[in-house]
Amino acid sequence: MKKNNKVGHGLSECTTIVVGGKLTGDGSRIFARSEDFDAMRCKNWLVFDDTENGPEEFVADDSSFRCPLPKKRLGYTALPDYQYHHEWGSAGFNTAGVGESSTETIFSSPEALKHDPYVENGLAENCTYNTVLPYVHTAREGVERLGAMIEKYGSAEGFGIGFIDDNETWYL
């Protein structure tokens, strides 16, 4: 039997799993994502407090993306890789009980990109976490804020983002 050296060797993609409440025994909803980034880069668990005087602008560390932010910010947790302290928050919850899982890269076909191209200085996946989660009170608000940001700034790449709260689960 010929051994297939490609399976499980060097392949790694972020994968999102969404399970609705009708599929679990107790009605729980599950939203989870694997990570394909280097396992040797440790995570920081960051905790940010609620504030009335937060940053008024987000400035990306690795692109020219910037956007204004509301001064009032909910507290939230984030799990960035240690070398990206202010970006790539990836997953956590805010003090309103909204959870966000972000940084799942999605690739589009060349044909799709002809009709809906990426925007060089648009919103990228590494910027979504700190510009959305601290400012929303429901999962629905999360997907609405993210969608409005994509409409305003365009998207620099393809990505999938999930939001969950006590009542709803959303994936964009």
Residue ranges and their predicted role:
Residues N126-C127, R140:
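A structural signal for well-ordered alpha-helical segments within the folded catalytic domains
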